[in-house]
Amino acid sequence: MNNNVIIGTAGHIDHGKTTLIKALSGIETDTTQEEKDRGMSINLGFAYFDLPSGKRCGVVDVPGHEKFIKNMLAGVSGINLVLLLVDSREGIMPQTKEHIDILTLLGIENYIIVMTKIDLVEEEYRELVKEDIREFIAGTVLETSPIIEVDSISKKGLDNLLETIDKKTEDIEAKNIEKNARLNIDRS
């Protein structure tokens, strides 16, 4: 069991990554004035929160815009678990696919799919979006990933998400600190 887990966000722009992390942690990860003015993440954001079991989760909140994919790449190398966010109004979008491709190439295997903004969509439509997600991830490493519905503003579904993260992290082993260290260098 790993008592310290690093979670990364992934997903299309405006699917609620930063809002979810603020709802879970109370920390605003968009820290620059430009990010606030533009209403989107540009740089990596960092936060943390504790799970019901007492495990601490560090979070790397990545930008979802295609122009900032290099920033996303810089942030995901050390994560143990991915929260893949999908807006329940839009479903899988281009950056969702690109983020999945990148994370798959990096060998990341632990995912929770988070359907966001559920307050804006009827349940029947959400079920259709959920079916589309299941079809899209069939045959991939995400195939058995749980899909959790949340509304980050009202905090509906956050307790279920926290419990799911807690359960999912039981199987994540701590990094072997006896191995040779590896330092990823951003060559931009």
Sequence positions of predicted segments:
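Short flexible coil/turn linkers enriched for glycine and charged/polar residues
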Residues: M1-N3, M40, S53, E109, ...
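Conserved catalytic-core segments of large NTP-driven translation/proteostasis enzymes
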Residues: E135-S188
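Signal for well-folded cores of large energy- and translation-related assemblies
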Residues: S25, T29, Q33, L73, ...
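Conserved Switch II/interswitch segment of TRAFAC-class P-loop GTPases
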Residues: R56, V62-K67, V76-L128
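Residue-level signature of catalytic and energy-coupling elements of molecular machines
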Residues: D14, L20, G39, D61, ...
